[in-house]
């Protein structure tokens, strides 16, 4: 018979093994658990597009409708819309018109100016329309599947683009609807120039990427079990290399200073921009003239924020839905893609996002999740998640204290997004973290993953048409070929490019 002390030792050893296994599995779950949604991709064909299994309807039988607008002939509108849906039906989807626009899955409306969806139109020119992606997991439909067209525009009704010059400043409605309906049924932008979803005006024929994108969303999606639709060549299509332009990457982004651009709102809605604006416009904010009147003087916090802004002092800078946002104290500036400031700004951050904070605060980070929800980081460690459709606050998340254990102060931690990856940085310690849980994805993150050297005193990193580093001394530097630009004495004052007053 085994002595009692030996039995105790065996029990202790077994207990230690069990504890080690439990701890190991727990750490594995904490640090390697990804909340990303896997996207099924057909690797047998070249692809240049981004798809999400979230964006799409739960059926291939899709109803559509259009609300007439007095300015346009109803027959012209219906003929144009019918032509658009007939083209998209070549992908294997079945589109059916119904009279009641409120009951349709894809709904086309004409609106002017502010129309209560947080994306006001700007009158004739520039912004032509936008569309909201469908979401198969949403219980409430909301704006999903809606296409909004700026009713102040002058459209002509012709599905051929060869003779656009004959119509002066008129806009081809067929081209706009064809692209926007693509978004309304779930497609993001494509980097393939032959695609309808390429972010510039194109023809009226679907490209290979358009077919492949619909296949991945509706026929080869792991959430569905339909028979996979076989692509048939309805017309001759050019195939291109699967590589994408260097400026495009895997993001739904594109250069904003090119002619005939379709300006997109990333992962939520897409905005179509009239192609005839000044081609010399850049993403750099244009000069702003502030008239400090007595009304400003009664609001000391706003006056202080404006003075800080004009001297180059910012808390963070980010691109949200394709537009530049600069945050200073409790206020933020919002710029159009051509660098012009939206009317009425700066506004309090709580005006745009219902951050439940009483008293003074500052935004220290702002980014979008992979599914398009907007996250506002306040005072370094608190993050508020806003729904991509309703813009309602649905979650508050604290940055885990153990994330950067050697960080001397949480107020030195910055969170930023680069090329669809989220990072936390403190005292030159870098960790890739999960968009949703803010937990660590890797025990060790290589600095080379960032594509730029770690610089001290950073307050944020901006990734849009290049990578820019911002420091707490009101200066910035552009990263060129994975190096900080040394030809301009490294860092320049923010007032040279970003906060021009």
UniProtKB/Swiss-Prot annotation:
Residues 1-26 form the signal peptide. InterPro entries: Hemopexin-like_dom_sf (IPR036375), Hemopexin-like_repeat (IPR018487), M10A_MMP (IPR033739), MetalloPept_cat_dom_sf (IPR024079), Pept_M10_metallopeptidase (IPR001818), Pept_M10A (IPR021190), Peptidase_Metallo (IPR006026). The active site is at residue 180. Binds 1 zinc ion per subunit. Glycans are attached at residues 48, 58, 61, 94, 116, 163, 192, 267, 280, 291, 379, 493. Keywords: Glycoprotein, Hydrolase, Metal-binding, Metalloprotease, Protease, Signal, Zinc. It comes from the Viruses. Zn(2+) binds at residues 179, 183, 189. PROSITE patterns: HEMOPEXIN_2, ZINC_PROTEASE. Its EC number is 3.4.24.-. Its cofactor is Zn(2+). The keyword Ribonucleoprotein does not apply. One of its GO terms (cellular component) is extracellular space. Coiled coil: none annotated. One of its GO terms (molecular function) is zinc ion binding. Pfam families: Hemopexin, Peptidase_M10. One of its GO terms (biological process) is collagen catabolic process. Hemopexin repeats lie at residues 311-356. CDD domains: ZnMc_MMP (cd04278). Belongs to the peptidase M10A family. This is Putative matrix metalloproteinase.
